[in-house]
Amino acid sequence: MSQEVFMPGATTLGLVCKDGVILASERRVSYGYFVMSKSGKKVFKITDTIGAACAGLVADMQILMREVSAYIRIYNYETRRDAGVKSTAKLMASLLFQRRMFPYLTQTIVAGVDSSGPSLYVLDPLGSVLDDKYASVGTGSEIAIGVLESEYKDDMSIEEAKKVVADAFKSAVARDVGSGEGADLLIMTKDGIKEESLKFA
């Protein structure tokens, strides 16, 4: 008797803009062909200017975010300074690598704004860290990345980037059964994080 392996679906993406960073993930939580939830949250605030967005098992995402947030709070308390985006991504990479024999089944994008400006890092389940200007992870990423590559510009404003995010999600949701139900956005600037939502037509 064959046993089918089900992987959770998702589309998650991030873009660096001239005045900040946007992280976004759609809300559908699916497992194989079954939609478990239509309101799953896959974007997470880590600090006042740093966030993360994930694709994969929601339980793994949640525990990883709790762990990272706790370590960052300890770091901020002990050093009396805020952790940067790169150091937050490296901390998360270290936690992922520690679990490489039994990895968290999640692909993660960490982004935010610090003294170096806006930045974005992509992490795989084993802790590899890649910095980029835009990224997409999850089952719908192959579709979304095509839109990002054709529409992304280095000097985009937040408002222009929101339109690119909407276009990428519309394309991904039209073809990927694991993605849908609208999206949650984290918009990060030097002034803080704003949360918004996006509805698909």
Functional labels for PLM-detected ranges:
Residues M1-A201:
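Long, low-complexity N-terminal extensions
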